[in-house]
Amino acid sequence: MSVHINAAEGQIAETVLLPGDPLRAKYIADTFLEDVVLYNEVRGMYGFTGTYKGKKVSVQGTGMGVPSMSIYANELVQSYGAKNLIRVGTAGGITPDVKVRDVVIAMSASHDMAQNRVRFNGLDYAPTASFDLLHKAYMTAKEHGIDAKVGQIFTTDQFYQDDFHHFKKWADFGCLAIEMEAAGLYTLAAKHKVNALTILTISDHLLTGEETTAEERQTTFNDMMKVALETAIQL
């Protein structure tokens, strides 16, 4: 048991999917997993363990942003022995190369994250995915006919921005999308010597203004889940 996760020893798998939305965690468990057990509902942040094609997999909601995600990632690794952390979530597209509902696999994450500014005394750290997970996810997408885009993304602390135009600079340097957790996850995984990957669905596009509905963001991103779960059973 940890401060924010009320699971018994052995209830959490070594591979954990990390959606930000706890209701998406429930949807994933109900839709894709078998023999599901609810191991956590502290603060309404649901955690489930089940099986996918016979492989034990957990799914844990994390909340939004690096500070909230970091609490759950730390406790999963330090208290429950998680070895593979796969974030599944949404992002905003910032380049014409990605469209709404595309799957993006985040190779690395530039950021404006305050935590790393403090952690590295103002120096720049390059949060990067685990290559083994990245390679498995990319090959899995290809095998299932899913046109996943692989590249750099941008992690921001601010959901509401005064000016979105500054993200054009990041797009000019190859960033595909914006989200709020990946850089923190990759940093923590490096610190604790575990594997981490972020797989995203583009839910809206800052260039075109196109967006998905709240219901779609919760329930319909099945290509992303196919890639994540088929990757998970290889670990």
From Swiss-Prot:
Site (Important for catalytic activity): 217
Signal peptide stretch: none
One Gene Ontology molecular-function label: purine-nucleoside phosphorylase activity
Active site: 204
Record-listed E.C. numbers: 2.4.2.1
Family that this chain belongs to: Belongs to the PNP/UDP phosphorylase family.
Protein name per the record: Purine nucleoside phosphorylase DeoD-type
Species of origin: Exiguobacterium sibiricum (strain DSM 17290 / CCUG 55495 / CIP 109462 / JCM 13490 / 255-15)
